[in-house]
A protein has these predicted regions:
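Conserved aromatic-histidine-acidic binding/catalytic patches
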Residues: 17, 38-45, 178, 182, ...
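A short, conserved, highly charged catalytic patch centered on acidic carboxylates
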Residues: 1-73, 81-94, 106
Length: 487
């Protein structure tokens, strides 16, 4: 279920001549008597009240009035119905955190708009009450944004430097000692494959080793490859936690959070639960068939120690403070999430030494526009070197925006069209994991309606495409159809 134990107890606040029944952070709740939302006139009155309450509450924040208003949620409910209100300063279409039972179409007869948005009234049921509880919980949790993640998981902070230090030590032990053969095997395979990805750039990046070590509060004289292996493992671990929490929310509101209570287990219990995570079974149980494939970053389970368990608990406990519903509540906040997180974890000098340069979100959007892709169904979008999935995310948003312009479009149809039409390849296993996670984040609003899901991001070398037999004696078969935008 949805844990709201962290939310403050409701308080009553009087504004001008009116009274707000309760405020949870930025959530304003107006309680109505039985049957008071049964008529159209009563609903109009409730909307006006919520609008007034939210505007007056936002004035308390002075210069932050408009931004606080965008973060506010108004809720009116009686014994049978519930109504939600949000504000947007730009033209948008807003949705509830989880789909309300009975909704069969995507934004029926709704166009993007700015100002106040009203959703409902909906019947009070499990899904509408879950949305209410998620709004309440979100008011007490940190948003899942790159800036907020950086304040906890950035290398200058304890969670990151303690865990990376322990992972580095574990990787070094695994290479030196025969009792950790799986660690040595994973490292050797990572070294081989990333040698193909980075080529001679790894040697050129050695001069960034000391800077990276200082960033993570490690002593001088570290081995760059082993440190990069540890940082990659840390980054992969964070992505897996983000993805499993998002799926726990979207697949079934009654599926428990993965991280909730995990840090309270003993060392063996934490390892058992993380083994389940790394096996991919948790993702498969939640309808994602291929999230973890050819993953090099579960090796730490074979180098498990008390110190490593303690460091893992620190990261798990910190992740539990973030709201997994952020990609649904505020989709724009989570764009570039993993790219920016990686840029924080791997310093610029090392990234550039490795030849890693990321495309800014605004430039990716511009290039997708110039390529002529508008998200129309029937047109496929392929990025054959997708990296962390920046262009794939842009394509998914274009497809959703195209759907929003229609009068009525069924959510499942849009979601399936995206899965069939937006795909990527990459040779880098870490990039594939990042792209799949970014794909899930961008696809979050469709997850409840499409199952099972196979994320169309594949680990392969697009420079060496598979051979195909000619369709006839005179014509070579086309690898891609004419309606595919190859990026």
């Amino acid at each position: 279920g949805v844990d709201v134990s962290i939310a403050e107890y409701e308080k009553t606040t009087a504004l001008t001549a009116k009274r707000m029944d309760a405020v949870y952070g930025y959530v304003v709740i107006e309680y109505k008597g039985p049957g008071k939302l049964a008529s159209a006139a009563a609903v109009r009155k409730a909307k006006d009240q919520l609008k007034t309450y939210l505007e007056e509450e936002s004035l308390r924040h002075g210069a932050e009035t408009e931004s606080s208003l965008e973060k506010a949620v108004g809720i009116a409910l009686d014994d049978r119905h519930i109504l939600f209100a949000r504000y947007s300063k730009t033209a948008r279409i807003l949705s509830t955190p989880v789909p309300i039972e009975g909704q069969g179409v995507l934004f029926p007869e709704v166009r993007p708009q700015f100002g106040f948005h009203y959703q409902g009234p909906f019947p009070i049921n499990a899904s509408s009450l879950t949305s209410l509880l998620i709004y309440v919980r979100a008011a007490a949790r940190r948003p899942l944004t790159a800036a907020d993640l950086a304040t906890v998981f950035g290398p200058e902070h304890e969670v990151a430097n303690v865990l990376v230090s322990e992972l580095y030590s574990a990787a070094m032990r695994g290479q030196r000692r025969s009792q950790f053969p799986r660690v040595a095997t994973f490292y050797a395979e990572w070294d081989r494959l990333f040698g193909v990805v980075y080529g001679e750039k790894l040697e050129k990046a050695e001069k960034a080793a000391e800077e990276t070590a200082m960033l993570y509060h490690l002593p001088t004289g570290i081995r760059l490859k082993s440190l990069l292996f540890a940082i990659h493992t840390f980054y992969a671990f964070l992505m897996k936690l983000i993805a499993i929490e998002l799926l726990a929310l979207q697949r079934d509101a009654r599926v428990d959070s993965f991280v909730e209570g995990l840090a309270a287990l003993d060392d063996a219990g934490v390892r058992t639960r993380l083994s389940e995570l790394e096996s991919g079974s948790g993702f498969q149980d939640r309808g994602i068939s291929n999230f973890l494939e050819a993953d090099f970053f579960s090796w730490y389970l074979d180098a498990w120690t008390g110190k490593l368990a303690s460091a893992m608990r620190g990261a798990i406990r910190a992740m539990a403070d973030f709201e997994p519903a952020t990609p649904v509540l505020e989709p724009d906040w989570t764009r570039d999430l993993l790219q920016k997180l990686y840029e924080l974890l791997v310093p610029k000098m090392l990234r550039h030494g490795l030849g890693e340069y990321y495309t800014p979100d605004w430039l990716a959007g511009y290039l997708v526009t110039k390529a002529g892709y508008d998200g129309a169904p029937g047109v496929r979008f392929l990025d054959p070197a997708c990296g962390s999935g920046t262009f794939l995310v842009q394509a998914i948003h274009r497809a959703a925006q195209h759907a929003e312009k229609q009068d009525t479009v069924r959510i499942a149809e849009v979601g399936r069209a995206i899965l069939d039409g937006v795909m990527g390849f990459d040779l880098n296993p870490l990039a594939v994991l990042a792209a799949r996670t970014n794909y899930l984040i961008a696809f979050a609003r469709f997850l409840p309606y499409v199952s099972p899901v196979s994320i169309p991001v594949y680990l392969c070398d697009s420079v060496l495409p598979p051979d195909r037999e000619p369709e006839n004696d005179n014509h070579q078969a086309e690898l891609f159809s004419p309606d595919t935008v190859v990026f």
